[in-house]
Protein backbone atom coordinates (compact mmCIF):
# COMPACT_ATOMS: atom_id res chain seq x y z
CA UNK A 1 0.00 0.00 0.00
CA UNK A 2 1.26 3.51 -0.84
CA UNK A 3 2.59 5.53 2.10
CA UNK A 4 0.50 8.72 1.96
CA UNK A 5 0.28 10.96 5.01
CA UNK A 6 -3.09 12.26 6.18
CA UNK A 7 -2.52 15.77 4.76
CA UNK A 8 -1.68 14.48 1.28
CA UNK A 9 -4.56 12.00 1.36
CA UNK A 10 -7.02 14.69 2.37
CA UNK A 11 -5.73 16.92 -0.42
CA UNK A 12 -5.94 14.11 -2.98
CA UNK A 13 -9.49 13.24 -1.95
CA UNK A 14 -10.49 16.90 -2.15
CA UNK A 15 -9.05 17.16 -5.67
CA UNK A 16 -10.84 13.98 -6.65
CA UNK A 17 -14.10 15.33 -5.21
CA UNK A 18 -13.71 18.56 -7.20
CA UNK A 19 -12.45 17.17 -10.51
CA UNK A 20 -14.04 13.75 -10.90
CA UNK A 21 -16.88 13.12 -13.32
CA UNK A 22 -18.47 10.98 -10.63
CA UNK A 23 -21.45 12.73 -9.10
CA UNK A 24 -21.16 12.79 -5.29
CA UNK A 25 -23.91 13.89 -2.92
CA UNK A 26 -23.66 13.80 0.89
CA UNK A 27 -26.81 13.40 2.96
CA UNK A 28 -27.46 13.58 6.69
CA UNK A 29 -29.62 11.29 8.81
CA UNK A 30 -32.73 13.37 8.03
CA UNK A 31 -32.26 12.93 4.30
CA UNK A 32 -31.11 16.52 3.74
CA UNK A 33 -28.44 17.18 1.16
CA UNK A 34 -25.53 18.78 3.00
CA UNK A 35 -23.00 18.90 0.16
CA UNK A 36 -22.39 17.85 -3.41
CA UNK A 37 -19.63 18.28 -5.96
CA UNK A 38 -19.81 20.23 -9.22
CA UNK A 39 -20.35 17.08 -11.28
CA UNK A 40 -23.60 16.43 -9.40
CA UNK A 41 -24.97 19.68 -10.80
CA UNK A 42 -25.62 17.78 -14.03
CA UNK A 43 -28.40 16.08 -12.07
CA UNK A 44 -29.34 18.55 -9.33
CA UNK A 45 -28.93 22.25 -9.90
CA UNK A 46 -27.66 24.22 -6.91
CA UNK A 47 -30.33 26.77 -7.80
CA UNK A 48 -32.93 24.20 -6.72
CA UNK A 49 -34.64 25.03 -3.45
CA UNK A 50 -34.35 21.47 -2.14
CA UNK A 51 -34.49 20.56 1.52
CA UNK A 52 -34.25 16.78 1.42
CA UNK A 53 -32.53 14.20 -0.73
CA UNK A 54 -35.77 12.43 -1.56
CA UNK A 55 -37.21 15.64 -3.02
CA UNK A 56 -34.05 16.60 -4.89
CA UNK A 57 -33.20 13.13 -6.22
CA UNK A 58 -36.70 11.73 -6.76
CA UNK A 59 -37.57 14.67 -8.99
CA UNK A 60 -34.72 13.63 -11.30
CA UNK A 61 -34.92 9.84 -10.91
CA UNK A 62 -36.58 7.71 -13.60
CA UNK A 63 -36.33 4.46 -11.64
CA UNK A 64 -33.69 1.89 -10.73
CA UNK A 65 -33.10 -1.63 -12.01
CA UNK A 66 -34.08 -4.62 -9.89
CA UNK A 67 -34.86 -8.28 -10.51
CA UNK A 68 -38.40 -7.43 -11.62
CA UNK A 69 -37.98 -4.44 -13.95
CA UNK A 70 -35.41 -2.36 -15.80
CA UNK A 71 -36.85 0.85 -14.38
CA UNK A 72 -38.86 0.71 -11.16
CA UNK A 73 -39.67 2.86 -8.14
CA UNK A 74 -40.91 -0.06 -6.03
CA UNK A 75 -38.88 -0.48 -2.81
CA UNK A 76 -36.96 2.68 -3.66
CA UNK A 77 -33.35 2.82 -2.55
CA UNK A 78 -34.15 6.09 -0.70
CA UNK A 79 -37.35 4.89 0.91
CA UNK A 80 -35.94 4.00 4.31
CA UNK A 81 -34.55 6.09 7.14
CA UNK A 82 -31.67 3.66 7.71
CA UNK A 83 -30.75 2.25 4.29
CA UNK A 84 -28.35 -0.61 3.85
CA UNK A 85 -25.20 0.00 1.84
CA UNK A 86 -26.10 -0.90 -1.72
CA UNK A 87 -25.00 -0.64 -5.35
CA UNK A 88 -27.42 -0.59 -8.24
CA UNK A 89 -28.19 0.77 -11.70
CA UNK A 90 -30.39 3.84 -11.84
CA UNK A 91 -31.78 6.09 -14.57
CA UNK A 92 -31.55 9.83 -13.89
CA UNK A 93 -32.82 12.86 -15.77
CA UNK A 94 -30.09 15.44 -16.29
CA UNK A 95 -30.67 19.20 -16.02
CA UNK A 96 -31.13 19.31 -19.81
CA UNK A 97 -33.82 16.58 -19.46
CA UNK A 98 -31.83 13.72 -20.99
CA UNK A 99 -32.34 10.33 -19.34
CA UNK A 100 -29.04 8.55 -18.69
CA UNK A 101 -28.10 5.27 -16.98
CA UNK A 102 -25.75 5.37 -13.99
CA UNK A 103 -24.09 2.92 -11.67
CA UNK A 104 -25.08 4.22 -8.25
CA UNK A 105 -24.08 3.54 -4.67
CA UNK A 106 -25.76 4.63 -1.46
CA UNK A 107 -23.50 4.05 1.53
CA UNK A 108 -23.12 5.16 5.11
CA UNK A 109 -19.69 6.80 5.49
CA UNK A 110 -20.03 8.00 9.09
CA UNK A 111 -21.93 5.69 11.43
CA UNK A 112 -21.79 8.06 14.39
CA UNK A 113 -23.01 11.18 12.55
CA UNK A 114 -25.13 9.08 10.17
CA UNK A 115 -23.80 10.71 7.02
CA UNK A 116 -24.50 8.96 3.72
CA UNK A 117 -22.89 9.27 0.31
CA UNK A 118 -24.94 8.92 -2.88
CA UNK A 119 -22.64 8.54 -5.91
CA UNK A 120 -23.37 8.22 -9.62
CA UNK A 121 -21.12 7.07 -12.45
CA UNK A 122 -22.33 7.54 -16.03
CA UNK A 123 -22.39 4.20 -17.84
CA UNK A 124 -23.96 5.45 -21.09
CA UNK A 125 -20.88 4.56 -23.22
CA UNK A 126 -20.78 1.01 -21.84
CA UNK A 127 -24.53 0.57 -22.36
CA UNK A 128 -24.23 1.86 -25.94
CA UNK A 129 -21.38 -0.57 -26.68
CA UNK A 130 -23.35 -3.45 -25.18
CA UNK A 131 -26.43 -2.49 -27.19
CA UNK A 132 -24.43 -2.32 -30.42
CA UNK A 133 -22.90 -5.73 -29.72
CA UNK A 134 -26.33 -7.12 -28.87
CA UNK A 135 -27.87 -5.59 -32.00
CA UNK A 136 -25.12 -7.10 -34.18
CA UNK A 137 -25.64 -10.47 -32.54
CA UNK A 138 -29.42 -10.30 -33.01
CA UNK A 139 -28.98 -9.08 -36.60
CA UNK A 140 -26.89 -12.17 -37.38
CA UNK A 141 -29.52 -14.38 -35.76
CA UNK A 142 -32.32 -12.57 -37.59
CA UNK A 143 -30.59 -12.97 -40.95
CA UNK A 144 -30.02 -16.66 -40.20
CA UNK A 145 -33.68 -17.05 -39.19
CA UNK A 146 -34.82 -15.31 -42.37
CA UNK A 147 -32.67 -17.62 -44.47
CA UNK A 148 -34.04 -20.66 -42.64
CA UNK A 149 -37.59 -19.40 -43.20
CA UNK A 150 -36.88 -18.91 -46.90
CA UNK A 151 -35.48 -22.44 -47.08
CA UNK A 152 -38.57 -23.77 -45.29
CA UNK A 153 -40.94 -21.98 -47.69
CA UNK A 154 -38.84 -23.18 -50.62
CA UNK A 155 -39.12 -26.78 -49.36
CA UNK A 156 -42.87 -26.36 -48.80
CA UNK A 157 -43.31 -25.09 -52.35
CA UNK A 158 -41.12 -27.84 -53.81
CA UNK A 159 -42.45 -30.75 -51.76
CA UNK A 160 -46.14 -29.90 -51.93
CA UNK A 161 -47.15 -27.23 -54.43
CA UNK A 162 -44.66 -28.04 -57.19
CA UNK A 163 -45.16 -31.80 -56.80
CA UNK A 164 -48.94 -31.43 -56.98
CA UNK A 165 -48.60 -29.25 -60.08
CA UNK A 166 -46.34 -31.82 -61.73
CA UNK A 167 -48.88 -34.54 -60.96
CA UNK A 168 -51.64 -32.43 -62.49
CA UNK A 169 -49.46 -31.77 -65.54
CA UNK A 170 -48.80 -35.49 -66.03
CA UNK A 171 -52.48 -36.39 -65.63
CA UNK A 172 -53.52 -33.70 -68.11
CA UNK A 173 -51.00 -34.97 -70.66
CA UNK A 174 -52.33 -38.53 -70.29
CA UNK A 175 -55.92 -37.35 -70.46
CA UNK A 176 -55.79 -36.60 -74.19
CA UNK A 177 -54.88 -40.23 -74.94
CA UNK A 178 -57.90 -41.65 -73.10
CA UNK A 179 -60.46 -43.18 -75.44
CA UNK A 180 -62.67 -44.93 -72.91
CA UNK A 181 -65.31 -42.59 -71.39
CA UNK A 182 -65.23 -44.32 -68.00
CA UNK A 183 -61.45 -43.95 -67.77
CA UNK A 184 -61.77 -40.34 -68.94
CA UNK A 185 -64.21 -39.57 -66.12
CA UNK A 186 -61.97 -41.37 -63.60
CA UNK A 187 -58.91 -39.39 -64.72
CA UNK A 188 -60.88 -36.14 -64.60
CA UNK A 189 -62.00 -36.84 -61.05
CA UNK A 190 -58.42 -37.63 -60.07
CA UNK A 191 -57.26 -34.32 -61.56
CA UNK A 192 -60.01 -32.58 -59.58
CA UNK A 193 -58.67 -34.14 -56.38
CA UNK A 194 -55.10 -33.11 -57.21
CA UNK A 195 -56.23 -29.54 -57.90
CA UNK A 196 -58.14 -29.47 -54.61
CA UNK A 197 -55.02 -30.62 -52.74
CA UNK A 198 -52.97 -28.00 -54.56
CA UNK A 199 -55.40 -25.23 -53.59
CA UNK A 200 -55.36 -26.37 -49.96
CA UNK A 201 -51.55 -26.42 -49.89
CA UNK A 202 -51.35 -22.89 -51.29
CA UNK A 203 -54.07 -21.68 -48.91
CA UNK A 204 -52.29 -23.20 -45.89
CA UNK A 205 -49.02 -21.57 -46.89
CA UNK A 206 -50.78 -18.24 -47.45
CA UNK A 207 -52.51 -18.38 -44.06
CA UNK A 208 -49.24 -19.20 -42.36
CA UNK A 209 -47.57 -16.17 -43.94
CA UNK A 210 -50.45 -13.72 -43.36
CA UNK A 211 -54.09 -14.76 -42.80
CA UNK A 212 -56.52 -12.63 -44.81
CA UNK A 213 -59.16 -13.19 -42.10
CA UNK A 214 -57.03 -11.15 -39.69
CA UNK A 215 -57.30 -8.09 -41.94
CA UNK A 216 -60.91 -8.68 -43.00
CA UNK A 217 -62.58 -10.00 -39.84
CA UNK A 218 -60.21 -9.51 -36.89
CA UNK A 219 -58.57 -11.61 -34.21
CA UNK A 220 -61.48 -13.89 -33.32
CA UNK A 221 -62.01 -15.18 -36.85
CA UNK A 222 -58.27 -15.41 -37.54
CA UNK A 223 -57.64 -17.45 -34.39
CA UNK A 224 -60.51 -19.86 -35.00
CA UNK A 225 -59.28 -20.49 -38.53
CA UNK A 226 -55.69 -20.91 -37.35
CA UNK A 227 -56.63 -23.33 -34.56
CA UNK A 228 -58.60 -25.51 -36.98
CA UNK A 229 -55.57 -25.59 -39.26
CA UNK A 230 -53.34 -26.63 -36.33
CA UNK A 231 -55.66 -29.49 -35.44
CA UNK A 232 -55.89 -30.67 -39.05
CA UNK A 233 -52.16 -30.43 -39.81
CA UNK A 234 -50.56 -31.32 -36.46
CA UNK A 235 -53.27 -32.93 -34.34
CA UNK A 236 -52.92 -30.12 -31.78
CA UNK A 237 -56.09 -29.33 -29.84
CA UNK A 238 -56.40 -25.67 -28.83
CA UNK A 239 -58.83 -24.96 -25.97
CA UNK A 240 -59.88 -21.42 -26.78
CA UNK A 241 -61.76 -18.88 -24.64
CA UNK A 242 -62.38 -15.25 -25.52
CA UNK A 243 -64.62 -12.28 -24.81
CA UNK A 244 -63.59 -10.15 -27.79
CA UNK A 245 -66.00 -11.73 -30.32
CA UNK A 246 -66.19 -9.35 -33.30
CA UNK A 247 -64.44 -6.40 -31.61
CA UNK A 248 -61.79 -4.83 -33.84
CA UNK A 249 -58.57 -3.28 -32.57
CA UNK A 250 -55.83 -1.23 -34.15
CA UNK A 251 -54.27 -3.17 -37.02
CA UNK A 252 -50.81 -3.15 -35.43
CA UNK A 253 -52.21 -4.45 -32.12
CA UNK A 254 -54.08 -7.27 -33.88
CA UNK A 255 -50.94 -8.26 -35.76
CA UNK A 256 -48.83 -8.29 -32.59
CA UNK A 257 -51.37 -10.34 -30.60
CA UNK A 258 -51.79 -12.84 -33.44
CA UNK A 259 -48.05 -13.29 -33.99
CA UNK A 260 -47.21 -13.63 -30.28
CA UNK A 261 -49.92 -16.26 -29.80
CA UNK A 262 -48.79 -18.01 -32.98
CA UNK A 263 -45.15 -18.05 -31.82
CA UNK A 264 -46.09 -19.27 -28.33
CA UNK A 265 -48.13 -22.15 -29.78
CA UNK A 266 -45.35 -22.98 -32.24
CA UNK A 267 -42.85 -23.19 -29.35
CA UNK A 268 -45.22 -25.45 -27.39
CA UNK A 269 -45.71 -27.66 -30.44
CA UNK A 270 -41.99 -27.87 -31.14
CA UNK A 271 -40.47 -28.14 -27.66
CA UNK A 272 -43.12 -28.86 -25.00
CA UNK A 273 -44.22 -32.27 -26.26
CA UNK A 274 -47.95 -31.58 -25.88
CA UNK A 275 -51.09 -32.24 -27.90
CA UNK A 276 -53.21 -29.59 -26.22
CA UNK A 277 -52.70 -25.87 -25.58
CA UNK A 278 -55.00 -23.44 -23.76
CA UNK A 279 -55.44 -19.96 -25.22
CA UNK A 280 -57.42 -17.19 -23.51
CA UNK A 281 -57.99 -13.73 -25.01
CA UNK A 282 -59.64 -11.18 -22.73
CA UNK A 283 -60.36 -7.49 -23.06
CA UNK A 284 -60.19 -5.79 -19.66
CA UNK A 285 -60.13 -2.23 -18.37
CA UNK A 286 -56.32 -2.38 -18.48
CA UNK A 287 -56.19 -3.57 -22.08
CA UNK A 288 -56.00 -6.76 -24.10
CA UNK A 289 -54.60 -9.86 -22.39
CA UNK A 290 -53.59 -13.06 -24.17
CA UNK A 291 -52.57 -16.11 -22.15
CA UNK A 292 -51.11 -19.26 -23.67
CA UNK A 293 -50.73 -22.30 -21.40
CA UNK A 294 -49.10 -25.63 -22.14
CA UNK A 295 -48.65 -28.35 -19.55
CA UNK A 296 -45.59 -29.83 -21.16
CA UNK A 297 -41.89 -30.10 -20.45
CA UNK A 298 -41.24 -26.50 -19.42
CA UNK A 299 -37.69 -25.13 -19.41
CA UNK A 300 -35.14 -23.33 -17.28
CA UNK A 301 -35.38 -19.61 -18.15
CA UNK A 302 -31.83 -19.08 -16.89
CA UNK A 303 -30.38 -21.41 -19.51
CA UNK A 304 -29.84 -20.69 -23.19
CA UNK A 305 -33.14 -21.38 -24.99
CA UNK A 306 -33.45 -24.18 -27.52
CA UNK A 307 -33.12 -23.19 -31.16
CA UNK A 308 -32.04 -19.65 -32.04
CA UNK A 309 -33.85 -18.02 -29.13
CA UNK A 310 -35.44 -15.61 -31.61
CA UNK A 311 -38.93 -16.87 -30.78
CA UNK A 312 -38.87 -15.55 -27.22
CA UNK A 313 -36.90 -12.49 -28.28
CA UNK A 314 -39.36 -11.81 -31.12
CA UNK A 315 -42.36 -11.97 -28.80
CA UNK A 316 -40.88 -9.30 -26.54
CA UNK A 317 -39.84 -7.16 -29.50
CA UNK A 318 -43.30 -7.33 -31.04
CA UNK A 319 -44.99 -6.49 -27.73
CA UNK A 320 -42.79 -3.43 -27.28
CA UNK A 321 -43.99 -2.10 -30.65
CA UNK A 322 -47.44 -1.51 -29.11
CA UNK A 323 -46.18 -0.70 -25.59
CA UNK A 324 -47.09 -4.19 -24.43
CA UNK A 325 -45.31 -6.68 -22.19
CA UNK A 326 -44.68 -10.42 -22.34
CA UNK A 327 -44.29 -12.44 -19.15
CA UNK A 328 -43.05 -16.04 -19.24
CA UNK A 329 -43.62 -18.34 -16.28
CA UNK A 330 -42.14 -21.80 -16.67
CA UNK A 331 -40.94 -24.72 -14.57
CA UNK A 332 -39.28 -27.90 -15.77
CA UNK A 333 -41.85 -30.67 -15.94
CA UNK A 334 -44.75 -28.32 -15.17
CA UNK A 335 -45.25 -26.48 -18.44
CA UNK A 336 -45.19 -22.86 -19.49
CA UNK A 337 -47.53 -19.87 -19.21
CA UNK A 338 -46.96 -16.96 -21.59
CA UNK A 339 -48.95 -13.79 -20.90
CA UNK A 340 -49.14 -10.86 -23.29
CA UNK A 341 -50.62 -7.58 -22.06
CA UNK A 342 -51.31 -4.75 -24.50
CA UNK A 343 -52.90 -1.39 -23.66
CA UNK A 344 -55.80 -0.53 -26.00
From Swiss-Prot:
Instruction: Give the residue range of the signal peptide.
Output: none
Protein location: Cytoplasm
Q: Does the keyword Transmembrane apply?
A: no
* GO CC, alphabetical: cytoplasm; membrane
Q: Does the keyword Phosphoprotein apply?
A: yes
Q: Ranges for the Histidine kinase domain? A: 147-344
Single GO MF descriptor = iron ion binding
Q: Please report the name of this protein according to its UniProt entry.
A: Oxygen sensor histidine kinase NreB
Q: What lineage does UniProt assign to this protein's organism?
A: Bacteria, Bacillati, Bacillota, Bacilli, Bacillales
Amino acid sequence: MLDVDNLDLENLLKKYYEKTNEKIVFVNKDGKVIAMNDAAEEIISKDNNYSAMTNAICNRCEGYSNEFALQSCINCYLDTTKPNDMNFQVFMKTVDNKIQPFTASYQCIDDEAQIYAFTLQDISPQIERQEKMYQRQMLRKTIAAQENERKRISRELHDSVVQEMLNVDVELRLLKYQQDMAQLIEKSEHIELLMSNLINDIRDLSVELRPSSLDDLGLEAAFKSYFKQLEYNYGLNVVYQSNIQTIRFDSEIETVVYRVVQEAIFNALKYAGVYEVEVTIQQTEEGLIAEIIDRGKGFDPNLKPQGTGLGLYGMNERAELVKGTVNIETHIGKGTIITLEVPV
